[in-house]
Amino acid sequence: MSERAPVVTVDGPSGAGKGTISQLLAERLGYKLLDSGAIYRVLALAAIHHNVELDNEEALTLLAAHLDVQFVTGNESKGIKVVLEGEDVSITIRSQECSNAASKVAAFPRVREALLRRQRAFAEAPGLIADGRDMGTIVFPTTPAKLYLTASAEERAQRRYNQLQDKGFDVNIDQLLSEIKERDDRDMNRSVAPLVPAEDALIIDTTNINIEDVLDLALTHIHQKLQVPA
């Protein structure tokens, strides 16, 4: 496939800094943003809103094909705003109900295919930053501008620990580290769309470098690949 507009893919494991870098890149370049990790949760919430049964593959597929969702940047302190049918659902989609429902809708092959097409439709002028786990390998494999962010499991656990502590949650860092390692193993070894860098991706290890340096590396790569101002 070929994209209708410039696309930058940002893949990698949880906690590597994808979300932060994707938001900063979208703001710096004036590009649209796709948070693919939220897509299934958004679809699940849309199904709940429209009284679509979570075992109705045909209805879910139709809903997925016309999913009215936007990812809005511009408030770095609050992160990306997820808007479904004009309503801010950034907090709602993180509920356990949405999480459980997302797992159910993701089980249907036709729903996954419809959401794949829907994600590709985000590639519109002036450009797109696509944040996910298989953006460069499955969703936008032909874009020349691919980034893969990674960091040690220990560093990612520490970042997650700090985030949860800041939000008032009482968490155990050893448990977080164990969960991250288990998810890494599951994601990297699954048979469908495993978490691996695209062959032509720029791999950035964010373990020991600050966000400004990561951003500089990313912008330089994008400038070289897409010929856009860095």
UniProtKB/Swiss-Prot annotation:
Q: Pfam families recorded for this chain?
A: Cytidylate_kin
Is the keyword Transferase assigned to this protein?
A: yes
Write down the species: Shewanella pealeana (strain ATCC 700345 / ANG-SQ1)
Q: Which residues bind ATP?
A: G12, P13, S14, G15, A16, G17, K18, G19, T20
Q: From the Swiss-Prot or TrEMBL record, give the protein name.
A: Cytidylate kinase
> GO MF annotations for this entry?
ATP binding; CMP kinase activity; dCMP kinase activity
Question: Tell me, what is an example of a GO biological process annotation in this record?
Answer: pyrimidine nucleotide metabolic process
UniProt catalytic activity: CMP + ATP = CDP + ADP; dCMP + ATP = dCDP + ADP
Where is the protein localized?
Cytoplasm
UniProt cross-references to HAMAP family, sorted A to Z: Cytidyl_kinase_type1 (MF_00238)
- Highest taxon above the source species: Bacteria
